[in-house]
From Swiss-Prot:
<dbReference type="GO" id="GO:0009535">
    <property type="term" value="C:chloroplast thylakoid membrane"/>
</dbReference>
<keyword id="KW-0812">Transmembrane</keyword>
<comment type="subunit">
    <text>PSII is composed of 1 copy each of membrane proteins PsbA, PsbB, PsbC, PsbD, PsbE, PsbF, PsbH, PsbI, PsbJ, PsbK, PsbL, PsbM, PsbT, PsbX, PsbY, PsbZ, Psb30/Ycf12, at least 3 peripheral proteins of the oxygen-evolving complex and a large number of cofactors. It forms dimeric complexes.</text>
</comment>
<dbReference type="GO" id="GO:0019684">
    <property type="term" value="P:photosynthesis, light reaction"/>
</dbReference>
<keyword id="KW-0604">Photosystem II</keyword>
<dbReference type="Pfam" id="PF05151">
    <property type="entry name" value="PsbM"/>
</dbReference>
<keyword id="KW-0150">Chloroplast</keyword>
<dbReference type="InterPro" id="IPR007826">
    <property type="entry name" value="PSII_PsbM"/>
</dbReference>
<dbReference type="GO" id="GO:0009523">
    <property type="term" value="C:photosystem II"/>
</dbReference>
<keyword id="KW-0793">Thylakoid</keyword>
<dbReference type="InterPro" id="IPR037269">
    <property type="entry name" value="PSII_PsbM_sf"/>
</dbReference>
<keyword id="KW-0674">Reaction center</keyword>
<keyword id="KW-0934">Plastid</keyword>
<keyword id="KW-0472">Membrane</keyword>
<keyword id="KW-0602">Photosynthesis</keyword>
<keyword id="KW-1133">Transmembrane helix</keyword>
<comment type="function">
    <text>One of the components of the core complex of photosystem II (PSII). PSII is a light-driven water:plastoquinone oxidoreductase that uses light energy to abstract electrons from H(2)O, generating O(2) and a proton gradient subsequently used for ATP formation. It consists of a core antenna complex that captures photons, and an electron transfer chain that converts photonic excitation into a charge separation. This subunit is found at the monomer-monomer interface.</text>
</comment>
Length: 38
């Protein structure tokens, strides 16, 4: 069974892109909350 490189890349992007997007939003909200508390 051969591993399709394009399918592997597509799967990786499909997982990494939303994860990175959520991380960026999380970090932004965390920094804003810390600034508001101070």
């Amino acid at each position: 069974m051969e591993v399709n490189i394009l399918a592997f890349i597509a799967t990786a992007l499909f997982i990494l892109v939303p994860t990175a997007f959520l991380l960026i939003i999380y970090v932004k909200t965390e920094t804003q909350n810390k600034n508001k508390k101070d």
